[in-house]
A protein has these predicted regions:
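RNase H-like, Mg2+-dependent phosphodiesterase core
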Residues: 1-266
Length: 266
């Protein structure tokens, strides 16, 4: 699979040798076919290339030459036989928020549905796209999302234990199926443990979208409780930590108190 972003319909219609196909979902702007390659343009401006891997790579090189858009992914998803459960997490490295773990279960038919939605690693999507795609994913595949707030995280403070617990709970809820985990340090769950699994298995990519959507929703909730917008990540958080302290708010309810950048404010 190859994905381009910032692609215009008018540019695709000028391509020679491609025939128009009937769109398969309401989110498709245009679907073209040439030989063993499908070009699927979504309303977000993302163009998905699917089909024979060699033919897809050849077509992608041609599209790059004419600057059709920005190439953002060129890694084909691996395919397992039968039902596969993919799990991924979000907020693990964020100062604000607790943890969110999501699981998605799919077979060949549902994997095709996820591909037609344009599912990719959530890191390739803007926040708005993540929230929109998460809702679509929930409507076509079995899924589960586990979200814990900072207060619960801080009662345990053992992130490895929590991650193993939440990944397993998601997989157990969706069982049966082969469990693929986005591998993390100390991972003891899953039949297949792979680093960067969200770029290799479409089930994990879909789970990464659900987990990140859950993280955004949790940060929105915590922001409403704090009375000001809480930042994502851990790089630019000092002003927000200072604001928490100035307002006399309980740090345990908003941040991971075991993070080194938090300790100086306690």
């Amino acid at each position: 699979m190859v994905v381009f972003e910032g692609v215009k319909k008018e540019s695709l219609l000028k391509l020679k040798g491609f025939s128009k196909e009937q769109p398969k979902t309401v989110h498709e702007e245009l679907r073209l076919k040439k030989g063993e390659v499908y070009l699927i343009l979504y309303s977000s401006g993302k163009l998905l290339l699917q089909g024979n891997q060699d033919a897809v790579e050849k077509a992608a090189k041609e599209l790059e030459k004419i600057n059709i858009g920005k190439k953002i992914s060129a890694e084909a998803f691996r395919k397992e036989q039968g039902w596969v459960i993919g799990t991924d997490e979000s907020l693990k490295g964020d100062t604000f928020g607790g943890l969110v773990v999501a699981g998605v279960k799919a077979n060949d038919e549902l994997r095709q549905g996820l591909a037609e939605l344009g599912v990719v690693d959530s890191k390739l999507l803007a926040d708005k796209e993540v929230l929109q795609m998460a809702e679509k994913i929930k409507h076509i595949v079995p899924c589960e999302v586990k979200s814990i707030l900072p207060e619960e995280y801080n009662r345990n403070r053992e992130v490895t234990f929590l991650l193993n617990k939440l990944h397993k709970e998601c997989a157990d809820y969706l069982f049966p199926g082969k469990h693929v985990v986005d591998k993390f340090p100390g991972c003891t769950v899953g039949e297949i443990q792979v680093e960067r699994a969200e770029s290799k298995y479409i089930e994990v990519a879909a789970a990464s979208v659900l987990a990140r959507a859950g993280a955004l929703q949790q940060l929105d909730y915590l922001s409403s409780q704090a009375g000001f917008r809480l930042p994502k990540g851990s790089t630019h958080v000092k002003l927000a930590l200072f604001e928490l302290k100035e307002r006399g708010l309980d740090f345990r309810k908003f941040v991971k108190v075991d993070f080194s950048n938090v300790k100086e404010f306690l």
